[in-house]
Amino acid sequence: MTISIKSFLIVSESCTKKLNLEKLTLIIVQVLLYYEEMKGAYVMCGFVGCMTDVEKNNESNCKDKIKEMNDMIVHRGPDDEGYFEDKNITMGFRRLSIIDLEGGHQPLSYDNGRYWMTFNGEIYNYIELRQSLIEDGYEFKTDSDSEVILGMYAKYKEKCLVYFRGMFGFVIWDKQEETLFCARDQFGIKPFY
């Protein structure tokens, strides 16, 4: 199993102990800030996840803890919630819808479930990137910029980051390779916590 991190990612021992997650090797909690000008209030989106060194997440109680953590951030993403679970990884997501309100449910999968992603942010040049992928034969199922990220990752792997213009943070799990790729925009507008 490989973990590739293209970001500042802090894994907290104290967080692990507070959540009583045994054999936990990685917790990812991303909290993202979005200012809603009309209401004058801060609305936040986020995703949570854990990766264990146990083959089955249920042995480490990871799924229950991710549900609990995701419930704690409901105020940050009131429009939708979603979960993904594989051998030793669980992801949870809370969404504030901006683009493709119906098609942007996450975690989002690609390539018959090989890749799974949670994403928050905005890719400003996603229309150009989408067109490039269409020219390469990719057929989109949604209008979401999230799906563009997955298509670019499938095509370019870690090098996909050089193509993105915007503010973003995401995590992609490759079921086939059993790798976790974490990234955020180069300025840290959408940081990992």
Enumerate the predicted regions with their spans.
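Compositionally biased, low-complexity intrinsically disordered regions
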Residues: 5-6, 23-26
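A periodicity- and composition-biased signal for non-globular, repetitive helical segments
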Residues: 12, 23-24, 36
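Polybasic, lysine-rich low-complexity intrinsically disordered segments
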Residues: 17-23
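Short, Lys/Arg-enriched N-terminal segments with co-localized hydrophobic residues
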Residues: 27-43
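Accessible peptide chain termini
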Residues: 1-2, 44
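N-terminus-centric sequence/structural signature that marks the extreme N-terminus
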Residues: 39-193
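Exposed, low-complexity/repetitive linear segments and helix-based recognition motifs
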Residues: 10, 19, 33-34, 142
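Low-acidity, Ser/Thr- and Arg-rich intrinsically disordered low-complexity segments
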Residues: 2-8, 12-15
